[in-house]
Structure formats: structure tokens, C-alpha cells
Amino acid sequence: MTKIRSQFPAVFLRSLVFTIAAAMLAAVSPAQISQSKIVRADLPKPEIDRIVKKFTDNEFMFRQALMDYVFNRSAEIQTIGMGGQVTGVYRRDSFMTFTGDGRRFERITFFPVSTLTEISVTPEDIEDLGGVNPFALEPSAVAEYNFTYLGKEKIDELDLYVFDVSPKVIPNPKKTSQRLFTGRIWVDDRDLMIVKSKGKGVPETKQNKFPVVETWRENVDGKYWFPSYSYADDELVFDNGLSVRMRMKVKYTDYKLGRTEVRILEDDD
């Protein structure tokens, strides 16, 4: 079975420009989305370590905060034929809210019959689209990754640190269901928050292949960077020789605080 998975947390004016740019991504091509103009530069290792510690701390805090927000999610997955025509579509629109006892609950608002025939979407895939990036770059996971600082890139009004991220050891899929992230992240140089990521999950298996997904985030309530738009246009090549081109678009909108116990942890740094 083929699994399609999502990749993927207070300065208002700066974040507003970045949010508007993310909202416009649906109208641009994959090549435009992926353009990168990194200015190569070195930083002392202690400074790199400080940046990594700060943005991983923030990532943990924002993931916890996201669980207290309701939002709308629109997900569409397409398979693309040799001539560029759409050969199958999976569409699922949802309102992500809570049950009476506070658990996350997906209320489906639009879910037509899927016409996908070459790949399938599993319940686990849908769970990944719930809004919380399954590849947690949090303090507890830092030891599992190599973070390579590449330099800086300016996107709209934001100056961003750019890091390549790769697992030190690829998990053995025969022994564990753990997946790790391999790809690239962009970190705001003032607030030290991840505002963009591009990568995929590893390991892959004979039947489960994952696309490279690019995710942009938007500033919510002036303090959190939550997923805004995810996009993939990739070719999945399976061990039996089957090759499937797929395209995925996921939009997250209308974030609202659904519970009141969200707290911002102040950092003394």
C-alpha cells in the first residue's frame, strides 16, 4: 500500500508579508516554489548549537500549542499521467476540532469518492495531515539528526537561517515504525522559529514511498508559526518498477483557539 505523507510552528508585520506569500503559492509552479538563493556563510559551532537548541525548543512549544487550536484543512492528492493529465483525485476537507473530553477530532465537511487507482491513502496518512508534523525536530530528537548550516536566505521580509537535516542512522523498518525527516528547513533569524521546510520521511519500504513535500507556515496570534500550505509534485518509484507521478496540495486555514489552557513559555535567553 502506498502512503502519501505530509511534511512538516512575533513580529506581526514581517510575518504578515510571509503569510501572504504562502497564500499565493497555490498559483505558482513547482519550480517557482522550489527556487532558492542561499548566501553561503559560516557560523561558529557554539552559535549553530544555540540556534538549533532554540528552534527545537520552539518547535516543541508550538506543537503543544497547536493541539489547542481548531482549524480547517483541505487536502487534495492527484495522480498525473504521461501527458500531464490528472488520472485520479483524492479530496478530503475537514474541520479539525475537539471531542468533549478534549481529544483531537476530524469533522469531515467534503469527501467525494476517491478516483485514485495507482496509489492509496491510508488512515495513517490522514492522521499525518492533522496538522502536527510527524517528523518532530524537538529537543528529544536532536541527538538523532545531523544539522548542517548552509547560510542565509531572504524570503520576502524575512532573513532566514538555512539548515540541511539528515538522520544519523536510518531506522530499520523491519524493527520499528519510526520515521525521521531528511531535507531542509528555514529558520527565522530573529525569533528562531521554523517557517518553512522541504523534505520527506525515511525509511521507505518496497511498498511505501514518500514524496518530497514543501511546507510553508504562517504566523498565528503573533506568536506561533503553524502550517499554512503544503505542496508536493513528485515521482514515486517502487521496487517492482512501477512509477507514479503524484501531486499533493494541503491548505490549513482559519486557526482559532479552541481551548484556553495554551501558555507561552518565556525564554530567559
Residue ranges of predicted features:
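Bacterial N-terminal signal peptides
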Residues: 14-27
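Structured extracytoplasmic
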Residues: 32-182, 189-196, 200-211, 219-227, ...
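Extended interaction regions within the primary functional domain
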Residues: 1-4, 26-29, 225
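N-terminal secretory signal peptides that target proteins for export/translocation
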Residues: 1-13
